[in-house]
Amino acid sequence: MSDISPDYPTLQSIGWPWPGPPEEAAWKAVFAAHPQALPARVVEQHRTGYVVADTPEASLKAESLPEWQRPRFPSHERAAVGDWVLMEGKRIVALLPRRTSIKRGAAGAHYHQQVIAANIDTVFIVCGLDADFNPRRIERYLLLVGGGGAQPVVVLTKADQTEHAEDALAVLEELEAQNIPLRAVNAKDPASVAALRPWLGDGRTAVLVGSSGAGKSTLTNTLLGTEKMKTNGVRENDSRGRHTTTHRALIPLPSGACLIDTPGMRELKPTGEEDLAEGGFSDVEALAAQCRFNDCAHIAEPGCAVRAAIEADLLDPERVANYMKLRVEVASAAEKLATRVAQNNRGKGSGKRPASIDRPGRR
């Protein structure tokens, strides 16, 4: 790590968002509170701690804030891969505000949020064109991305292993109509993967998300031009992978961009902050607003614009069914979130530290 002053041009090479010192008031305030600290980016996240870097070539194990080590400390308020922190020596002394993020509801009965990646420009939703292909899961990922400030791009891998790539793209054409880019690639072929270049320019940060075995690590290796990430095969009976990536890591690419690889995620629960219109269902939401009844369930009500669109083959009925399911899940999570916020507000008077819920803005 540097021990003099921030080298902003070098920091830009790992995603620093400005040519010099921070320009946002919230960031300036944190810097002012820690005048001796230097910025660094979280490039690895492990159960035992973090690895941070202030150049593409050098990194170090960092000592986290003491409160982050408390079992009941909100997980989404701890640093995640992609976060910017302030360092004094090897110690993290502050977490800088997130500009964007992708989050999910953590597994378990109690309400928690988990940050998958922070300060990202693009989310590559990776899905294999084999038994892994699942439009409903893609829609769930799009919901989690929506409202977080990053651009979603659906990447269909293993395009070389199927004759049905065009059929898969047709299934997802309703998404493309909402300006959600779709790309079918052979993850092992640099010429094919070049289709992702528009989102991997100098200083930009992208994250790969998708199920285990979808080809995320293979895609990472091709973009790097080297076998940096370990890859395994997939089970022939169900095309499921063996969790090649075991932790989240930020990797500088030759293009000047940064790429975050993530382990496959089995559970994708909403946080309650999602916006269905921004999460891949803007067309369904627009039609729902035209229904005769405000509380239309889109099942058999008269004057239902959504059912009319389905009957006219303008909407995929399975996609609408998934929309209805996700709408219920978001509403349920929103109730749990409201309860948690109310509990935190009551805790203010007792001297307990409230757990804030960050809502990143669009970049």
UniProtKB/Swiss-Prot annotation:
Q: Can you quote the record's cofactor note?
A: Binds 1 zinc ion per subunit.
* Top-level class of the enzyme under EC nomenclature: hydrolase
Main localization (coarse) = cytoplasm
Q: Where does GTP bind?
A: 157-160, 210-218
The alphabetized list of GO BP terms reads: ribosomal small subunit biogenesis
Q: Give compartment(s).
A: Cytoplasm
Q: What segment(s) does the record annotate as region Disordered?
A: 340-363
InterPro entries, per database record: G_CP_dom, P-loop_NTPase, Ribosome_biogen_GTPase_RsgA, RsgA_GTPase_dom
CP-type G domain residues: 112-268
Molecular function via GO: GTP binding; GTPase activity; metal ion binding; rRNA binding
Entry's Gene3D superfamilies? P-loop containing nucleotide triphosphate hydrolases (3.40.50.300), Probable gtpase engc, domain 3 (1.10.40.50)
Q: Provide this UniProt record's keywords sorted from A to Z.
A: Cytoplasm, GTP-binding, Hydrolase, Metal-binding, Nucleotide-binding, Ribosome biogenesis, RNA-binding, rRNA-binding, Zinc
State its Enzyme Commission number(s): 3.6.1.-
Chain residues that bind Zn(2+): 291, 296, 298, 304
Q: Which GO terms describe its cellular component?
A: cytoplasm
At the top level of its lineage, which domain of life is listed? Bacteria
Recorded family membership: Belongs to the TRAFAC class YlqF/YawG GTPase family. RsgA subfamily.
* Assembly: Monomer. Associates with 30S ribosomal subunit, binds 16S rRNA.
Q: What function does this protein fulfil?
A: One of several proteins that assist in the late maturation steps of the functional core of the 30S ribosomal subunit. Helps release RbfA from mature subunits. May play a role in the assembly of ribosomal proteins into the subunit. Circularly permuted GTPase that catalyzes slow GTP hydrolysis, GTPase activity is stimulated by the 30S ribosomal subunit.
Q: What's this protein's name?
A: Small ribosomal subunit biogenesis GTPase RsgA
Species assigned in the record? Xanthomonas oryzae pv. oryzae (strain KACC10331 / KXO85)
